[in-house]
């Protein structure tokens, strides 16, 4: 090979990039890289961007303002999709660390609704589940309106089993049935590791179980995007969810992007819904 273009190199394993470069045996071989910024501890930032002069690299920093084909309203829409660390990375192009609250844009005055919409045959309904035995079992019932292009979490289930109040999958299934009631749900989105609970749901044949897309960082980006775009709301009764929103934080001790794995069960089921169902509902819109 005489050269390689690495598109979105920050998403590639370091071993893959180094193996591809090792195959460029032609004298004067060249490499091209592009990417959105990630954590400043990322190997590409440490080994290439910070060593640009040492490696004889031409490093160019671009933002949307450098793309003359983007209309002002398109740039404004993109800028409105992100806040916090994702705004600084994807809009400003900065290699910054994730810190503070994961969802600082969540606002009780903006994202909470007082009434549950009436059942509507044109709406689509989903349930998302974060399975727990010792840890809490959290689930949310979601109402998606195609005409309004928004979803509302209309009910929540938050069961703190613990070691003394642990129940079996049959009891959890009964709780889910009570949560769903008369809602004609599309399917139940569930933690992909909860194989025994998936089997229980499938055994009864009443609801379809779909394994959630458990990509944590991309799922967090989806939730962020939908909150900012005005596509995601919550009924006032979902109090455990609100409590988690206001404490769910980045782990600033980690070199890579990671959340603190405490009091995150409703946040997980919300992420499952956004990543697995709402992203598909809004893929041509947001």
For each of these PLM feature ranges, what is it?
Residues 10-11, 133, 146, 194:
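Short, glycine/acidic-enriched loop or turn micro-motifs at the edges of active sites
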Residues 67-131:
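ATPase catalytic-site recognition across NTP-hydrolyzing enzymes
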Residues 137-143, 271:
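Short beta-strand scaffold segments in enzyme catalytic cores
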Residues 3, 11-81:
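ASCE P-loop NTPase helicase motor core
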Residues 60-62, 91, 212:
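Hydrophobic residues at beta-strand termini and immediately following loops
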Residues 1-2, 95:
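Inter-Walker segment of RecA-like/P-loop motor cores
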Residues 140, 147-261, 278-285:
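Mg2+-dependent endonuclease catalytic cores in nucleic-acid-processing enzymes, primarily RNase H-like
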């Amino acid at each position: 090979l005489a050269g390689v273009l690495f598109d979105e190199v920050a998403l590639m394993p370091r071993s893959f990039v180094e193996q591809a470069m090792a195959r460029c045996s032609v004298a004067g071989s060249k490499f091209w890289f592009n990417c959105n910024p990630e954590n400043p501890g990322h190997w590409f930032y440490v080994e290439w961007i910070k060593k640009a002069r040492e490696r004889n690299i031409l490093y160019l920093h671009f933002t949307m303002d450098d793309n003359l084909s983007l209309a002002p309203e398109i740039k404004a829409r993109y800028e409105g999709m992100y806040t916090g660390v994702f705004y600084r990375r994807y809009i400003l192009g900065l290699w910054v660390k994730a810190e503070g609250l994961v969802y600082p844009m969540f606002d009780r005055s903006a994202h909470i609704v007082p009434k549950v919409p009436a059942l509507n045959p044109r709406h689509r309904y989903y349930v998302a589940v974060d399975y727990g035995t010792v840890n809490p079992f959290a689930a949310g019932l979601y109402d998606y309106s195609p005409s309004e292009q928004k979803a509302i979490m209309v009910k929540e289930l938050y069961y703190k089993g613990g070691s003394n109040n642990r129940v079996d999958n049959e009891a959890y299934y009964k709780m889910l049935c009570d949560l769903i009631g008369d809602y004609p749900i599309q399917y139940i989105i569930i933690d992909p590791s909860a194989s025994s609970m998936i089997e229980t749901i499938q055994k009864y044949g009443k609801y379809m179980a779909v394994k959630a897309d458990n990509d944590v960082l991309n799922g967090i980006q989806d939730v962020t995007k939908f909150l900012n775009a005005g596509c995601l709301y919550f009924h006032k009764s979902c109090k455990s969810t609100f409590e988690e929103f206001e404490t769910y934080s980045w782990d600033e001790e980690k070199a890579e992007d990671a959340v603190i794995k405490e009091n995150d069960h409703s946040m997980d089921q919300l992420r499952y819904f956004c990543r697995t169902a709402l992203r598909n509902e809004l893929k041509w819109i947001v």
